[in-house]
Amino acid sequence: MDASSSDWPVHQLWPPSGDKRRTDLDIVLFHGLQLTANDINHAWTSTWTQRGHDNVCWPREWLPCDLGEAVRIFSVSYDAHVVTSPHDHVSEIADNLFQNIVDRRYKWQRPIVLIGHSLGGLVLKSLGGLVLKSLVVKFERESTIRSPSNSFSQATARRAKLFLRNVRGVAFYAVPHAGSTNICTYVNKLFRCKNRHHRGIMGTIKPYRRDMNQLSVDFDRIVTEYEINIYAFCEGRPMEQGILVEFSSAQQSARNNCYKVEDANHMEVCKPCSKAHPSYALLLQFIIDCGKVAREFDQALQKVHDLHQSTFENYPTFQVKWRYWCSP
């Protein structure tokens, strides 16, 4: 589905509609909370614009250029408005995305990198939990008597397994893995409402929720079992209510790399100023390392170092683990 379609939750940013070129890597973007009614329809592009240039969707304009165009880029759309969203939990959004992304529409036969901003990171973690659940169901079906009440088919489990095995990396931009009181306060003040964070989708952001803690535990299991590489970015510049997602909440786990984007607040952290900006250059390095198997990625890596050598000298880099892929 191309980016011009508004009635489908997954929009293809690259390659253009009708382009049948061979691609070697899939990237899927998950946007965060929405503050206006207009955001509901456009967050899948407006979240990922160059800072100061709202007409430039940087994943569409920059990544194909720097990755040799051998990439397929999707951006996911869902209603995550802080007040009017019909969803009470990220799991409801993830359930719909599971059906549209994993179970029905796309074949996931390439390396995959998932990228989430704010609430979008929790959505993709919940999606991963549903994928894992479908595999557990498959195992139980093969080990015990089949139950007609089980909603996951064998075909669904096969597609889910292929999806998980191809996820090479996940990048988080200011995701409140441990919740955020400041986001709740910010929304309450913005909409002049009290205790909004106790209701609807905002309840997901509330700190110390047992179900969200379990979501992180389940996601860590997936990361460990499938050797998925993680990189996180956190905001370095406060908004009116301060830092909305603290470093400790944005990190996901103590073993993950987490880079503080000093000149960006919560809304700007996923909006790089230029290709040389660390929030883009480090992400690009991460994507390239996750997609080492692709034909054009070694050339792309050299190109990145040539363009941004000073950036990589001044900011932390990281070593992505190699992994062994079993046959289906």
Set out the residue ranges of the language-model regions:
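Eukaryotic intrinsically disordered and solvent-exposed regulatory patches
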Residues: 6-17, 59-62, 99-102, 154-159, ...
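Aromatic/acidic cage segments in peptide-binding pockets
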Residues: 43-56, 92-93, 154, 185-199, ...
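Hydrophobic/aromatic beta-strand patches that form the interior of the parallel beta-sheet core
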Residues: 28, 74-76, 169-171, 229-234, ...
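Alpha/beta-hydrolase fold catalytic core
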Residues: 1-25, 70, 257
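Active-site catalytic motif of lipid deacylating hydrolases and related acyltransferases
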Residues: 29-112
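Serine-dependent carboxylesterase/thioesterase catalytic core
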Residues: 31, 83, 91-220
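C-terminal catalytic-base region of ester-bond hydrolases, centering on the histidine
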Residues: 34-35, 81-82, 185-189, 218-328
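Short, conserved loop/helix-junction motifs that constitute active-site signature segments
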Residues: 21-22, 66-67, 160-166, 222-226
